[in-house]
């Protein structure tokens, strides 16, 4: 890893806060615990929770499509198992947000068909640049998602950390796993991708646009 990459990785690492918990602890009982601990459909900030669940569901769906595209190109190469492991975690993330969408009656973004195509195209397109291109995409996307999750964590902590305790735990857990994917990308030569810095900026600009649109539409 280059010196610049090491600094960036350290900076992202400082974003990690909270105590890690295994994903299995959340399970399907999350909804009951949310209600018993004070988070119900009646007493939450519905507008804020709607935005959080809708955009996070869209983001995890897009991440799944990115990894699907990468696996279509690199699935049979030596890096295939690495990508598959990250994809499996993203599948768990999407499953949880599917459950939250139903529990809190949140509609998905109308842009799902676009994220379906765009996510797969991004994953496959960067994978065609080789392992390094795919990992550069992973670094860019996962860093964007981790920062986005941190913004949500700060907002919920400021509003009512006890009321939103279970939702905060889910977001923190997923944030930490996204940062693990980010670090995996760096460990697998992301910075050796052609025009790495430019590619990363372009992908992260796209992520910012996707977040903005998915929160609102």
From Swiss-Prot:
GO cellular component: extrinsic component of mitochondrial inner membrane; mitochondrial inner membrane; mitochondrion
Primary localization: mitochondrion
Binding site for Fe cation 1: 60, 90, 93, 178
Disruption phenotype: Mice lacking Coq7 start to die after E8. Heterozygous mutant reveal that the reduction of Coq7 levels in these animals profoundly alters their mitochondrial function despite the fact that ubiquinone production is unaffected. The mitochondria of young mutants heterozygous are dysfunctional, exhibiting reduced energy metabolism and a substantial increase in oxidative stress.
Keyword Repeat in record: yes
GO molecular function: 3-demethoxyubiquinol 3-hydroxylase activity; 3-demethoxyubiquinone 3-hydroxylase (NADH) activity; metal ion binding; oxidoreductase activity, acting on paired donors, with incorporation or reduction of molecular oxygen, NAD(P)H as one donor, and incorporation of one atom of oxygen
GO BP: any one term: determination of adult lifespan
The protein's annotated pathway: Cofactor biosynthesis; ubiquinone biosynthesis
Record-linked InterPro entries: Ferritin-like_SF, Ubq_synth_Coq7
Segment annotated as transit peptide: 1-23
Disulphide bonds in the chain: none
Residue windows of the Sequence repeats: 48-129, 130-217
Positions that bind NADH: 51, 212, 216
Keywords of the record: Iron, Membrane, Metal-binding, Mitochondrion, Mitochondrion inner membrane, Monooxygenase, NAD, Oxidoreductase, Repeat, Transit peptide, Ubiquinone biosynthesis
Record note on cofactor: Binds 2 iron ions per subunit.
Reactions listed under catalytic activity: a 5-methoxy-2-methyl-3-(all-trans-polyprenyl)benzoquinone + NADH + O2 = a 3-demethylubiquinone + NAD(+) + H2O
SUPFAM superfamilies the UniProt entry points to: Ferritin-like
UniProt cross-references to CDD domains, sorted A to Z: DMQH
Cofactor(s) needed by this chain: Fe cation
EC numbers, comma separated: 1.14.13.253
Free-text tissue specificity from the UniProt record: Highly expressed in tissues with high energy demand such as heart, muscle, liver, and kidney.
Further information: In life-span analysis, transgenic expression reverted the extended life span of clk-1 to the comparable level with wild-type control.
HAMAP family: COQ7
Complex formation: Component of a multi-subunit COQ enzyme complex. Interacts with COQ8B and COQ6. Interacts with COQ9.
Protein name (Swiss-Prot/TrEMBL): NADPH-dependent 3-demethoxyubiquinone 3-hydroxylase, mitochondrial
Organism: Mus musculus (Mouse)
């Amino acid at each position: 890893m280059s010196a610049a990459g090491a600094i960036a990785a350290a900076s992202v690492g400082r974003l990690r806060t909270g105590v890690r918990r295994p994903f299995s602890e959340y399970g399907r009982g999350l909804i009951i615990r949310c209600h018993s601990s004070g988070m119900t459909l009646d007493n939450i900030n519905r507008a804020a929770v709607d935005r959080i669940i809708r955009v996070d569901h869209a983001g995890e769906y897009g991440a799944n499509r990115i990894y699907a595209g990468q696996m279509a190109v690199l699935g049979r190469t030596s890096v295939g198992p690495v990508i598959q492991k990250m994809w499996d975690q993203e599948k768990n993330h999407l499953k949880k947000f599917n459950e939250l969408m139903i529990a809190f009656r949140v509609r998905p973004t109308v842009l799902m068909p676009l994220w379906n195509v765009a996510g797969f195209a991004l994953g496959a397109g960067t994978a065609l640049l080789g392992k390094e291109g795919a990992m550069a995409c992973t670094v860019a996307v996962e860093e964007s998602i981790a920062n986005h999750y941190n913004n949500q964590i700060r907002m919920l902590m400021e509003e009512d950390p006890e009321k939103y305790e279970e939702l905060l735990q889910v977001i923190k857990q997923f944030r930490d796993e996204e940062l693990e994917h980010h670090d995996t990308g760096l460990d697998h030569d992301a910075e050796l991708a052609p025009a790495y810095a430019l590619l990363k900026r372009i992908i992260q600009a796209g992520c910012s646009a996707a977040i903005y649109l998915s929160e609102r539409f």
